Each structure stands twice: as C-alpha cells, then as structure tokens.
C-alpha cells in the first residue's frame, strides 16, 4: 500500500487481534492525542485508561473506527475517525457512556467540564469524515508514522470531505495536517477558539 514502509501494516481494531496489553497501549496513545479532553475526567489515570480502552472500536463513540499502524508487529500509531457527518452524535453518546461509569459527584464535575470544553471547539457545519484522534508513539515520531497513517486513511477512504480539530498551540499537528492538504476553515477566527477547525476536500 502506498505511503506505508516495509514491515508496516494497518488494521481496523475490530478486525485485528488486539491483546489486553495492546489495548492499554492504544488507550495511552488515544489519551496523548487529546490530553486536554481526557483531563476533564475527574478520576484516576488508571480508571481513565480503562474507560478509554473500553470505547476503542465501540459503536456510537469517537473511537468506533480506530486504525492501528504496526511496524514489525508493534503498535506505532493510531487514527480514529467518524464518517457520515456523525461526529456530534458520536461525541455525545461517547461522553454519555463515560458519564455512566462515573460516580455521582464525578458526573457533575465531568458534565460541567464538558460544557466549558465544547465552547473551545471552532464550529464545523459539515464535518463529513471527522478525524477524531491521531497519535504516534514517541519512539517513532521521527519516522513520520502518524503522517503515513493519515495519508493511508485518506487514500483508502477515497474522495470526500474530511475535517478535524487541532489545538492552536500544537504546531506539529497543525503542520502535519496542512502538509497533507488540510486548511483552516476560517482565517477570521484566530484567537477566538482554542481548537481550530481544519478541512480537506478530496
């Protein structure tokens, strides 16, 4: 497959053999892709990772379609995406599933945090296929695994509208997405939102 290197392969988690230890690695990668979001969860790191691991490949969540890039059999990078303009629904249902696993006081705190967080996302009217998570293990950052996985996903998915959010201070993620063709939805909202919306029409 174009963009992948020798000894690299990509699989959907729902079709791959994922061990318990790998689920934890994937959960850690997913958290690293959106650390400020998962920091909203008022619970221990271990519980947070367990909750995230439970949602990997789970329908009606942001992680429903999660792809794993392996190099020599070892997890190198992950990408999660939600198609058909369903990101708002997936985000809501995924959050509700998290809320149900929290205690009463934790729920109130998390819901309050979510409302504040939602205001920091630049609006996207037509999300198309939304790239919800993209992360690479630190040891393989220089190998460009994340960029290759993103290119693989775009090529495999075919023509269409793709969107994502990138934190305004995450210059590496902003550069990576713009390198493969994403652009800011609006140049007018600079400074208005912590998370900038990007779009790619293929």
Can you say where each PLM-predicted feature lies in the sequence?
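Conserved N-terminal entry element of GNAT/NAT acetyltransferase domains
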Residues: 1-24
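Conserved acyl-donor/pantetheine-binding loop and adjacent beta-alpha core of acyl/acetyltransferases
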Residues: 85-129
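Conserved catalytic-core motifs of GNAT/GCN5-like acyltransferases
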Residues: 165, 183-197
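Conserved beta-strand in the GNAT
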Residues: 68, 74-83, 130, 135
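Conserved active-site alpha-helix within GNAT-family acetyltransferase domains
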Residues: 143, 147-148, 169-186
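Conserved GNAT acetyl-CoA-binding A-motif
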Residues: 127-129, 156-168
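Active-site rim helix/loop that mediates acceptor-substrate recognition in acyltransferases
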Residues: 45-66, 70-72, 118
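Conserved GNAT-fold acetyl-CoA-binding loop/helix
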Residues: 34-54, 88, 110
């Amino acid at each position: 497959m174009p963009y992948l290197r020798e000894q690299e392969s990509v699989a959907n988690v729902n079709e791959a053999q994922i061990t318990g230890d790998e689920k934890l690695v994937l959960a850690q990668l997913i958290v690293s892709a959106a650390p400020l979001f998962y920091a909203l969860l008022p619970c221990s790191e271990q519980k947070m990772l367990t909750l995230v691991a439970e949602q990997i490949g789970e329908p009606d969540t942001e992680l429903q379609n999660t792809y794993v890039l392996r190099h020599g059999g070892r997890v190198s990078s992950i990408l999660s995406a939600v198609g058909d303009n369903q990101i708002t629904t997936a985000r809501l249902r995924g959050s509700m599933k998290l809320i149900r696993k929290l205690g009463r006081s934790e729920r109130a705190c998390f819901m309050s945090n979510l409302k504040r967080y939602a205001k920091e996302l630049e609006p996207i009217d037509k999300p198309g296929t939304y790239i919800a998570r993209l992360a690479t293990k630190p040891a393989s950052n220089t190998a460009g695994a994340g960029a290759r996985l993103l290119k693989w996903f775009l090529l495999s998915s075919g023509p269409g509208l793709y969107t994502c959010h990138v934190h305004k201070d995450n210059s590496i993620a902003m550069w990576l997405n713009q390198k493969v063709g994403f652009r800011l939805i609006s140049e007018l909202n600079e400074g208005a939102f912590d998370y900038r919306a990007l779009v790619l029409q293929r």
